[in-house]
From Swiss-Prot:
Function: Transcription factor that may act on the GAL1 promoter. Acts redundantly with MYR2 as a repressor of flowering and organ elongation under decreased light intensity. Represses gibberellic acid (GA)-dependent responses and affects levels of bioactive GA.
Protein known as: Myb-related protein 1
Stretches of the chain forming a coiled coil according to its record: 148-168
DNA-binding region location: 73-98
Keyword Nucleus: yes
Family stated for the protein in its record: Belongs to the MYB-CC family.
Region (Disordered): 238-266, 344-363, 382-402
Motif LHEQLE, chain ranges: 161-166
Gene encoding the protein: MYR1
Amino acid sequence: MYYHNQHQGKSILSSSRMPISSERHPFLRGNGTGDSGLILSTDAKPRLKWTPDLHERFVEAVNQLGGGDKATPKTIMKVMGIPGLTLYHLKSHLQKYRLSKNLNGQANSSLNKTSVMTMVEENPPEVDESHSESLSIGPQPSMNLPISDALQMQIEVQRRLHEQLEVQRHLQLRIEAQGKYLQSILEKAQETLGRQNLGAAGIEATKAQLSELVSKVSADYPDSSFLEPKELQNLHHQQMQKTYPPNSSLDSCLTSSEGTQKAPKMLDNRLGLRTYIGDSTSEQKEIMEEPFFHRMELTWAEEESLRENHNRPYLSTMVNNAEPRISSSRRSPGRLSIGVGLHEHRGRSSNNSEYTEERFNENNEDCKLETHTRTALDLNTHDENYGTTRPKQFDLNGFSWN
């Protein structure tokens, strides 16, 4: 029973739905008569297809009601008077119409465009134009960049990159050239250093040879020219003390002067004699060969100056009409100048000097020597036993010895 009733109910529902499905054809017109010209879909919420005629009637109704802002779906439905139109259909279409009105009267057909443009020109055209102008002007700076400028900028960037690459290449070439130049300089410096080392070795060899020559010369000629001044003075003092004692007389001096003719070099080395020859070249040779005697004369002159400063008695006896002593360069070749310095004890009197002068005058005539050279004899005797010394000088000029 219950099953029969349920099945019967289902049949009733199906029977009740059948006429609706038969009536709702995909596009049915109005109440089935087709007078209204409506085309509806078969969805749960049937959609209306707005044809140009239907839209034209909708626009007329909206215009009668005073425009899209004042018109409502209910008033539009009453004015149109088309059966089958619902508020849902009119409401959606009115919204679209208002949007199209706000977007400068866009319409679905060419007929609607004229009516929409007339409605838009009445109230909002200035606002829309200003807004459109602002919209058109706003994006122009960002969108209207010329393509030529962009290409020019790209070309400029590429050119700068190319220039930078060229500069880097030139720098690399210059760095390589500089490195090669420095390498060549280093090689040349090494070569010069090697040559300098060879030169230094040669210099050392020459120094060794010179030292050997000096040692040989000093061994062969142990003369005073290789000695120091102090050693020369000491040697001079020792030689003078050995040759002439402090109490030696003028006879010993004269005999020693005679011996100089026999052995001049020995006496020159021991007594400090210098033979002056008239020829200047020979005189220069003698001076260059015997520097020791020049130093002896200098030391003798210094001793004489010191004695004068200490105000000690100085006796000078001039012989042969008291002729003054002249320099050896002005004397004739046949004259002899002998300077004798006798150092005596402080306790001795001046009788010794007078006695020496008398003996010299007596022996003056016997001692005659014929010489063609000028001889300067400087004899200084130093006695270490005496506390003080009294220098005496005898200058003899104008004697020719036979």
